[in-house]
Amino acid sequence: MAVQQNRKTRAKRGMRRSHDALTSAALTVDQTSGEIHRRHHVTADGFYRGKKVIA
């Protein structure tokens, strides 16, 4: 098993963890239905950029 040779400092631990933060998904309100959906995705009722794309 891998065992560290030397203890890592709080600063090094923080540097490693600096990229671990999660970001929330970008949400948009649909022009037609006013529904909230993810950017560049079709809404649940089939609208994309104000047009019905799924019947």
From Swiss-Prot:
Pfam families: Ribosomal_L32p. It comes from the Bacteria. GO terms for molecular function: structural constituent of ribosome. One of its GO terms (cellular component) is large ribosomal subunit. Residues 1-21 are annotated as: Disordered. GO terms for biological process: translation. Keywords: Ribonucleoprotein, Ribosomal protein. Residues 7-16 have a biased composition (Basic residues). Belongs to the bacterial ribosomal protein bL32 family. This is Large ribosomal subunit protein bL32. The gene is rpmF.
